[in-house]
Structures are given as C-alpha cells and as structure tokens.
Amino acid sequence: MYYPFVRKALFQLDPERAHEFTFQQLRRITGTPFEALVRQKVPAKPVNCMGLTFKNPLGLAAGLDKDGECIDALGAMGFGSIEIGTVTPRPQPGNDKPRLFRLVDAEGLINRMGFNNFGVDNLVENVKKAHYDGVLGINIGKNKDTPVEQGKDDYLICMEKIYAYAGYIAINISSPNTPGLRTLQYGEALDDLLTAIKNKQNDLQAMHHKYVPIAVKIAPDLSEDELIQVADSLVRHNIDGVIATNTTLDRSLVQGMKNCDQTGGLSGRPLQLKSTEIIRRLSLELNGRLPIIGVGGIDSVIAAREKIAAGASLVQIYSGFIFKGPPLIKEIVTHI
C-alpha cells in the first residue's frame, strides 16, 4: 500500500500543515471520479446501536473533519460511521499555533486546538452537499467566549441547527482545551445540561418527526467516583449512548519523549490502556443500559478487539488513522 510513502512525506511537514495539505487534496477529489483513488472495499458487518444500523463497527472519531469538508472521501475509505466536529455555534480560530504535536516514537499526538471551526451554519451547508450513506455523527461544543454557566445554550443552538442532518449527536464536554468545559461532566452542572439537552431532543423529535440519538463524550481522567456519577446521570436522563474516551492530560507513559511536555490532550497509543480501562469500568456500571462507543489509541485489530471485549459496541479511530492510514480501516473491519 502506498500510505507509508505518503506518511513519510507528510511527516516532514508541521502536523497541522500536513493535515491542511491532506484535506486540501481530499476536498479536491470529494464528489468527483477521483474519489476512486481512496475508495476501499470493506466487508459489510452491520451493527445495531442507539436505534441506528451501522454498516460496520468502525467509525472515524471527531476532530479530524471538524467542518464536514471531506465526508464523502472519508466515507469512501470504508468507515461505517463518521463523526464530524467538534463544531460550535459561531466560528472561532482556536488556540494559538503551534497547537498540534507528534510523539512519533509513541505513535501519539498532543493537541490543544481549542475547537477551531467555521461554525455550525457552515458545517450544515457542507453536510447538505455530502452523499455519504453511513451513519453521520455531529459532535458539538461551546464557544470559548461563552461563559461555562451559559454553556448549555451553545449546545442547544447547535442541536437545533444540525438535528435534521445528523444520524446521531455527540455532546463534547470532555475536551481539555476549552477552559472550564470538563466541569460540565460533574454533579449539578451535568444534570442541568442533560435535562436541557433531553428536553430539546424531545422538542426537535416532535418538530422533525424523527428521533436522533444523543451520545455524551467523556474524559479518560475521571476518578472512580466521578465515573459512577456520570454513568448514573446518563442513565437517569435516558441518554442514548456514551463515547469513551476523549484525550488525556496524563503524561506518565510518554515521559522523556520529544514534545511530551506540551500542553493539551494526548491521544494515540499512549491512551490505549487508559481508555480501555474506563470502558471496562463504565460497562460494569452501566450493565447494558446504554451502549458504549470505544475510542482511544486503537491502532490495530487487537486494540479494537480489546475495546469491544471491555464493553464497547462500536469503535472509532483518529490518531491510529494518522499513523497507519486507510489500510487500518480495511484491516480492522475485515478482522474485528
């Protein structure tokens, strides 16, 4: 496969520049016959989850295609689902550059992007143009300059605008790169947010005559008590699924490596065990009451199987896709 050569060239570039260059090329071929260049035939392995039928259990995690610019090209690679975003009500530039770093030896990434995106209206226009026939998830967050106390309003604005176009909606309250965001994972703040989101979901269901499931994305850095509390809240509010996990602030497995001290969330292989353990504990706590989408450090068939054995119904990749390329999709879907 050609990807090792492509990766070698891309890894000569700054990580964000490499991402921009790749997306530039994908945008050029999206919706054209040249999409065949990235198309892969993968076996159909349908999974029913959250009331939806996924073509296969492997999805693309949020963060790669923040604005939904390359849905069709990414879909051609064989993903059973694609989660675009995180998107916010208003466009925002994100944090200052550099803000994305490779830990090549560990096959990890550290990012402090800060929800850079062109806003929810732009994303909706991109989604309208796409022809992807898999499940499209849309991951939503709050603008950096929205006070945390008013954060729920941003989620409700996004829900209203994307509801008609989303297969499912992911609520991102676990990015470490938006000040105060993770506080929405706890106690009254979480209950308040989930109550508002569930009420909005019911209103939108009545308006659009369709039910769009809601999944909440959680952090891997939760304590045992926090995890129990989160699980309890998700069940009480009849949330449809949970995505475990986002990136970690823990650097214990990458000490001494180049870029290890950069501020931000760590993803990729160093996150693998930590996220799997959260899934295992969450699965015990939930006891089948809602499905888990497992994400964090999946870079092989074995790693994907571990997530499913721990209790995940579906899995997602991001950093592993950067390091291994499209062949990883086919490999996982074929052998999972």
Swiss-Prot record:
It is an enzyme of class 1 (oxidoreductase). Pfam families: DHO_dh (PF01180). GO terms for molecular function: dihydroorotate dehydrogenase (quinone) activity. It comes from the Bacteria. The keyword ATP-binding does not apply. GO terms for cellular component: cytoplasm; plasma membrane. Keywords: Cell membrane, Flavoprotein, FMN, Membrane, Oxidoreductase, Pyrimidine biosynthesis. CDD domains: DHOD_2_like. It is found in: Cell membrane. FMN binds at A62, G63, L64, D65, K66, T86, N139, N172, K217, T245, G268, G297, Y318, S319. Its EC number is 1.3.5.2. Binds 1 FMN per subunit. Pathway: Pyrimidine metabolism; UMP biosynthesis via de novo pathway; orotate from (S)-dihydroorotate (quinone route): step 1/1. Substrate binds at K66, N111, R112, M113, G114, F115, N172, N177, N246, T247. It is a peripheral membrane protein. NCBIfam families: PRK05286.1-1 (NF003644), PRK05286.1-2 (NF003645), PRK05286.1-4 (NF003646), PRK05286.2-5 (NF003652), pyrD_sub2 (TIGR01036). Belongs to the dihydroorotate dehydrogenase family. Type 2 subfamily. Monomer. Catalyzes the conversion of dihydroorotate to orotate with quinone as electron acceptor. This is Dihydroorotate dehydrogenase (quinone).
